[in-house]
Amino acid sequence: MFFINNIIHILLNKQISKVYSKRFTNYNNTPKGVFWNSTLSQDLRLNIIINKILSLCKQNTISIADIGCGYGRLWNIIKERNLETKINYYGLDINKDFISFCQKNINCQNVSFELGTFPSKKVDYIVMSGTYNLTPTNSLKVWEKYVFENLCLNWKLADKALIFNCLINQNRQIKNSLYFTELLWIKELCENNFGKTEISKHNLLPNDLTITIKKLS
């Protein structure tokens, strides 16, 4: 069973990476290049995540792993907010074009980028913004299993909290290659398998949820 799951993950990752490579070639390092509608919506989602981390952290310096980092927009926002001296940032993505772009264009001592779906060591916070929205499969069962198993891997490596956002609808579904979850379902999944789960919404993002799962201190 593990072997089959591993093969499925590899195939899904290859399909996702192929779609993003084509998109990035057409739109470069813009919100459209990573399937976001606009700079406003992309940056709002990322700022919500940063604000959540800042509300939780107590230490002077923290480490963040950004899963599905794309062209590194989260790090750019961290710099724009003058937080770069406070944060050790690790950007991860399954797409080599994104990682290559980030390595060439972002050169900071406390920043690194690498291929992967989870960090190579424990960090304080692991975040995913839009990472599981776009899906190459129409099978809800296959995709939710993929998402859950990725969350499990990252939960083990998050020292303080796991924070991610997702699209929501009244019913869980895949529509136009986008995965929509349902509020009560995703909250129950996270609480039953991980820990205390906080759901937050923003009035400018009516179809989004931001989910924060905190580790016991």
Predicted stretch roles:
Residues 1-31:
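N-terminal, positively charged/glycine-rich alpha-helical extensions of SAM-dependent methyltransferases
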Residues 40-59:
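Conserved alpha-helix/loop element of class I SAM-dependent methyltransferases that forms part
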Residues 65, 72-109:
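Class I SAM-dependent methyltransferase SAM/SAH-binding core
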Residues 107-118:
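Conserved SAM-binding strand-loop segment of SAM-dependent methyltransferases
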Residues 125-144:
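A short SAM/SAH-binding and catalytic strip from SAM-dependent methyltransferases
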Residues 133, 167-172:
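Short "lid" loop at the C-terminus of a central beta-strand within the Rossmann-like core
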Residues 158-166:
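Conserved beta-strand signature within the Rossmann-like core of class I S-adenosyl-L-methionine
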Residues 174-217:
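Class I S-adenosyl-L-methionine
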